[in-house]
Amino acid sequence: MAVSAKYDEFNHWWATEGDWVEEPNYRRNGMSGVQCVERNGKKLYVKRMTHHLFHSVRYPFGRPTIVREVAVIKELERAGVIVPKIVFGEAVKIEGEWRALLVTEDMAGFISIADWYAQHAVSPYSDEVRQAMLKAVALAFKKMHSINRQHGCCYVRHIYVKTEGNAEAGFLDLEKSRRRLRRDKAINHDFRQLEKYLEPIPKADWEQVKAYYYAM
């Protein structure tokens, strides 16, 4: 993308207004927030960040976390993991301040696994549907961990499922994801983190997810 075109598109999305789904959070001299907008009949999510950086040996002075998240989403997509489709993802430095944007399409038909269980409590799904959903969650984890990548922020609100038609599962909010040298480290981190705040997933259902996972 040419520099001028990149800046033009960045400025276009930066100026876009919508409803806040994650109110601006100001900390460490930076800001982060997510708005929902409509474009050409599609629901999009615009994540904005200023001065949210990660540091590494390669980037000792820091790089925007959105740059890393974009790379992670693309890597997981190549591995067959269901993740939000990227419309735009860039970071620019303006007058010494990093600004970063990630625009993604809504995961149409998917709901968080927490919302799925809330619906299940009101209008129970069949055991066949529930088992298909649990197996889909196991498969999503298996694909992610197969490339030694851990989610890094593994909570029920970040696991999305769809049970209309073929059951599917995927992930969002991947800015803290990282690659581990050993696969078991990624598995243990994600599973232990999720198990600390497992509700509303019943423990028996989670044990079934792990049974499917280790049988794959």
Swiss-Prot record:
One of its GO terms (cellular component) is plasma membrane. It comes from the Bacteria. Induction: By several factors in addition of internal pH. Signal peptide: none annotated. Belongs to the protein kinase superfamily. KdkA/RfaP family. May be an environmental sensor responsive to several stimuli, including internal pH, proton motive force, temperature, and possibly other unknown factors. NCBIfam families: PRK09902.1. This is Protein InaA. It comes from Escherichia coli (strain K12). The gene is inaA.
